[in-house]
Structures are given as C-alpha cells and as structure tokens.
Amino acid sequence: LRGLSPNHVLVLVNGKRRHETANINVSGGLQSGSTGVDLDTIPLAAIERIEVLRDGASAQYGSDAIAGVINVILKSADHGGRLAYDNGRYGDGDGLTQNGGVNGGLRFGESGFLNLSAQFREQARTIRAGIDQRTGHYGNPSIGDPSLHRQALAYNAGVALDDNVELYSFATYTHRSVSSAQIYQLPSLAPRLYPNGFTPRITSDEDDYSLTLGARGGELFGAWDWDLSSTYGADRPEIGMDHSINLALYGETGDSPRSFDLARYKATQWTNNLDLRRDFDLAWLPAPLNFSWGLEQRRELYEVEAGDPWSYYNGGSKALPGQAPATAGQWSRDVLGAYLDLSTALDERWQLETAARYEHYSDFGSTTNGKLASRYRFSPEVSARASLSSGFRAPSLAQENYTSLGVSPTIASGLLAVNSPAARLLGAEDLEPEKSISYNLGLVLDPLPDLNLAIDAYRIEIRDRIVDGATYSGQPAIDALRAGGISIPAGLTQVSTHYMTNGADTRTHGLDLTASYLTRLGEWGRIDWRLGANVNRTKLVRNHRGRNGQPLLNDQQQAWITRSTPRSQVSLQADWSYRRWGLTLRETRYSKTVSELDYYTGEHAYSTTVFNRFENSPKYITDVALRYAASRNLTLSAGANNLFDVKPDKLPAESAYLGFNQYDTYASQISFNGAFYYLGAAYTF
C-alpha cells in the first residue's frame, strides 16, 4: 500500500491480527528484508470480501499499520455453497496452473452456523532465461517461477448461547510444497557425480495454520458490548536442497550427498484481546459519545533449527548452504498493549474521532501513538475527511536474527543477523522501532446518482526505517562471515555481506483516486465502470551513517526505496452485463521505474559502489474475462491476464548475469512470465 514495504501493512482476519511468515525476503528490491503476512495461506474459497483501510492505524491496532490495514472477512453463510475450478497456462506454453475450491455453509441449532472451505493449487514451473554464456544454450531454469503444490482448509463458525452471548471460532490451515531451480552448474564441477552438470533445487515443505476462539456479546454491566478472543498462528517451513553437492566433501572423499536438509524455521504468534464499547449520552454533546477501549497480550517466537552437518560443512551445499549451529536459535518476546478510541458527531454534519494506544515490548521498551480524524458532510453529494496520526513498526524477530548465505557460480552474498558477532564486527547496532507521522486529506463526491468519486492526498514520514543495507565486500566481508561461524566455498572471486539496519528516514507523499459509474443500456444490459489511480513518490530524507562514517545505503539500495515502484499507476475497468453474458475489460498503465544494477563485466564488475542505471519503460497491460451463465447454477468463463503478452524490458548485456538473467527482478512493474490464458467453471448450490 502507498509504495511502502509489506511490513508496513497490518493484516487482520475477521478483525484479528494475522501472524507473519517465517520466510524473510532476501532477494533484493523494496521488499528485501520484509517478513509480512503471506495472504496465499488464506484459501480464496473462504473469503467473502477484503476491506482496505488506506490510513495509518497504529493508534488503533498497534505495530505495522503505518501504510494501512487489510481486513480479510471470511464467509459466514449457513446454507448453500460454491464449487469452482480454473485451468490455464502462459503464452510461452509453460506454467500450467490449476485452481480448485469448494465452499459450503451449514446451519446447526436455531442460531449456529458452520462455513467450510477447501482449496488446491497446482502450478508447473516457468523458464524465462536468455542464452547462458557458459554453454551457448537457452533454458537456465533459475529464471522463472517455481513449481508449487498447495492445499488449504478453512472454517468459520458461530453460535448464540442467548440474546447477549455468542461463541465464535475460525481457522485456516495450508500445506505448500515448492521446488525452485537454481543456477545450472557445469559438468566440470563434479564430473563423477554429475557428468552432464546439475541444477540444484531448493525445496520448501511448509505448514501454516491459525486458530481463533472467542466470545462476544452485549449488556455487560448493563451497557457494554464486549469481545474476548484468543488467536494462535504459526508458519513452519522446512527447507531442503536436491540435486546439489558439497564440493569440499567431494574434493576430500570423491563423494557427497546429493540432497540436504538445510534448515527448519518457525514463527508463531499468540494474541489475546479484550475489547469493550458503549455509548454515553452527555448533555454537552449533541450525539452519543462512542467509547471503546481494549487490552492486548501477544507472545511472538522465531526459531531456526540447523540443517544436517554436510549442508553447512566447509562451504556447505552448492547454491544455498544450510544453517549451522552458530546461526540457529530461538528468540521470543512479549507485547502488552492498551488502547482508547472516542468518536462522536458534533452536529449532523461533523464527525470527530480520536484514539491512543500504548504498547510495551519486552525487548526494546514502550511506545505511545495517537490519531485524530474528522469527517464533514458539506451536502449529500460532498464530504471531506482528514486525519493525523503517529505510528510505529517493531522490527520482526526474523529481521533481528536471520542469517543466510547465497552462492552462485562466482558470487557469495550473506545476510548477517544484526545482533550476531559477524554483524557487530562490521559495526551493526541493535534495531530500533520505526516511527511515523501520517497526514491524510480527502474528498468524497457523489455528483450524480450513479457516479461516486473519492480523492485522498497523503504524506507519510518514517524515521529509522528498517532496510537491508550496510553492504561490505572483500576481506571485511570474509572476516565477518568467518566470525559468524559461516564457511565460504572455495574458488569464489566475489564475497559480500549486508545486514538489516535503521538506515533511512523517508518521506512518501501521493494521491489516490477511485471512481465508479454505472451506464444503463436498457435492453442491452449495463456497464459498471471503475477507475483507480495512484500517484506516489518516496524521497530519502536522510541516509544514516555507520560507525565508520560511511552511508549505510549505497546507490542501489537507495533506488530500491525511492524508484523501484511506479510513481503512477492508472487502471480503468469496464464490466458489461447482458442477459446471460458478461464481459470484463481492464487496462492498466504503470509508469517507468529505475534500477541501479550490478555490473558483471568491465572495469566496474561486482562493484558495491558503482552501478549501472537502468530504466524500465512504462507498461500497458490488458486483461479480459468473458463469462456465460449456462444455467441458473453453472457459470463458464474464459479470459486472459496480460492479453498482449507484454514483458519487462531486457537488461543490458553488462548487467545480465552470465547472459541468462534477462530481466530486472528488483524493479520491473510486471511479471516476466507474460500472457496467461485460462478457462474456468463455477457451480453454486
């Protein structure tokens, strides 16, 4: 949201905080170092709708809600259901994808409901590589999407015990298996084991689950509405490696395992909430005062289990070494919070709301945040809204404690845990919470019966932003890795390290525009028009400096923050409905983005200070979907995402690693997979 990191968005399910993923993004770009919520673990068949609050909300919800809040509402019907299936592939002929889902509602007793959902997804890999300079052939499978198998379940249930008490519960469970190809390794590397060369594959076997139990009701102590709940969520990926080798062991013995257990990760979150609300009639206010307050207790845990010994021995498994005992461990913290929210109408046109929240973290202390919001209705057609809020985001436990080393044929790059001896050797300091101030001003217009407009201007200032920075190369990097108990494979010519740091102060400002309009065509049906536009710019206000006096962010990392996302995005959609037919057409324009790319050839090859500036030109994407109601219950569909097979600009030769890496994966506005064509069917009952 609003050009910020996934870490700056709070995700709720049915109004309850969702746990974060145990996977940390280490691939570079704006998302580098992020550990946000994985929405893919919530089955699509279970979702009724998604609510988006594009405003700072830390004063109501606590950490993470700097850019806004996403609230996923699960289906709660007590009867009927839906069965859906779709099948498609990319225009290049690969990436066969199948999705299937079923949802149904049951009623029990006089007031109880149970809504059940199941979903599966099967996705074949894609390959978008150019010519490998080492072999002269196309098809290095490391450039493409991985193969994926996912199964997911969900339920949502509730029952009223009497007029004032309702019990409720909901849960999700997802199992996901992924196999991701890495860079092809030449036959000369291990001719006995792999006479034709080999392609290592990172595997992930992941279980993600969440359970909420709660009770809510009214008339507590005569007047209070109340909600008492407990939510436990966990993400547990097991990471392995197939078709690989430990080169050091192979050199010593002539043999090596080909598969390795690299690590097991776990991120858990246990949240307990008490929320209370009531209205007070006060003589000096023209309308009741809505008084809400609540308490929250949260326990967070992050765990890293070491891989098998050969996965990290003397350089470890090729492509990605396993976690060694020195980088494994378990870390946890406790969070206590309390909030107060007051709202009222000062007259029939003017609404006012104020909120404050206090939170105490066992690992870094306390924070207090506030919000003031107002809405004024000038007429039935024109309203204005404004808000001012402070916010914060605590560093995730993974950001503080995760270590990894990625290895390609000529490069090794390590992310060091910020509180590790290795990072301390380079001058790392403890992470502090990010702090923010948000300003929002908007207009809501209904100038015509079928026309709705909303325009919102915003400004978000973030201090001590947590970024992936502080890059070191050469001998300092090698010394730091060794100090952290990480061995480096022999024969590598370029070694670098980096760590998470409070490295930047930023200012983001922009404009959101949404519009909807209904065109009535009489006997020819209707067209629902939707327009969405965003203009957004992030400025680096301050580049923090390390102990050595050098800036923590180089030009490449600065570009990730300020230029890796489009500064404007406009989407126009028309949805035509005519008798049994429906046609949806959507056109989206993304403005250019800018990257500072690594050089892989020439005098600046592998430099961490000099980069190759590259512009991804503006892109226009066309999506189309056709549907037909074959019967009262059965709907057939066909469509294309990216109908005209638009792909990102290709990289210049000097920044295309070994020739096969064709695209800028850090700042491309669109996927490199191109057009996707599909057929589908849905049956309601």
Locate the predicted segments by residue.
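C-terminal beta-signal and adjacent terminal beta-strands/loops
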Residues: 537, 587-601, 627-685
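Outer-membrane beta-barrel signature, preferentially recognizing the C-terminal barrel domain
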Residues: 150, 206-208, 326-335, 381, ...
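Gram-negative outer-membrane beta-barrel transporters
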Residues: 452, 457-463, 467-599
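Surface-exposed extracellular loop regions of Gram-negative outer-membrane beta-barrel proteins
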Residues: 22, 234-238, 243, 299-316, ...
